[in-house]
Structures are given as structure tokens and as C-alpha cells.
Amino acid sequence: NDIEKSKIFYDNVLGVLGAKEGVFMPNLTGQTRYFYFLDKNTFCITEPIDGNEAHPGNGNTVAFNVPDEETGNKWHAVGLEHGGISIEENPGIREFENMKMYLAYLKDPSGNKICAIKIIK
């Protein structure tokens, strides 16, 4: 519910991944929105269009691809420096039955669950 605080957070964590500062693009009904462009992906933060308070999703996670563990660790550290909260296990490699991946989880300042991910082949 503090989009400017969220913008500062995402400017920094997505900056680690090469995104430029969020681009201000209000919608036609006046809500503030910021767009981030990452390679072939776009990420947006916005004030709720219905006028109600924003709430984090229950069971939702937005994942951002990282090229390696070092970048993921930096992404996580920068997130903590800008109001994020570390959740789940510490950043690192997790092994599953059919796959191995690097994961680093945070909650952003609004409580949304995000992670850095690298599939290891």
C-alpha cells in the first residue's frame, strides 16, 4: 500500500538483474504503476484498480531468473537492505527428485513472496 516504498525496493533488487529504474505509467483511471523491463520479461507494480487496499496473494510466488548463485545471493542481500524479509530456507541449492535448483526467497515490503531461481542442469 506504499507504492513508492515498493518502487525503491524493486528498483534495487531488479537492478541487480539488469533492470533500469521502474518506468512510471499511470493507468487511465489514475492509479500509479511502475514497469520494469528484464530481457524478454516485464514486471509491474501497481496501486489496486478497485480502490481497496493491496494484499499479498496466499500461495503465490513471483520468480526471477538469475544466471548464477552469486547473482542470486546479491539479489537476496540487496532485498534485505531495502526492506525485504528472508523467508523459507537460506539461499542455496535445493535438490528435488527430478531437478536441482538454486533458490533465494524474500517477502517484499508489502508482504509479497518473491524468489531468485536458477535451474541447474
Regions found by a protein language model. Give the residues of each.
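Glycine-rich acetyl-CoA-binding "A-motif" of GNAT/NAT acetyltransferases
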Residues: N41, K100, K113
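Short hydrophobic alpha-helix segments
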Residues: M25, N90-P91, I117
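Vicinal oxygen chelate
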Residues: D2-E4, A63-P109
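A short acidic/small-residue loop/turn micro-motif
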Residues: E95-F96, I119-K121
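Active-site beta-strand termini and strand-to-loop segments that position acidic
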Residues: Y34-K40, L106-P109, I119
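Conserved beta-strand in the GNAT
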Residues: F43-E47, Y105, I114-K118
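Long, continuous compositionally biased terminal/linker segments
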Residues: T32, Y36-K74, E81
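Core segments of cupin and vicinal oxygen chelate
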Residues: N1-F43
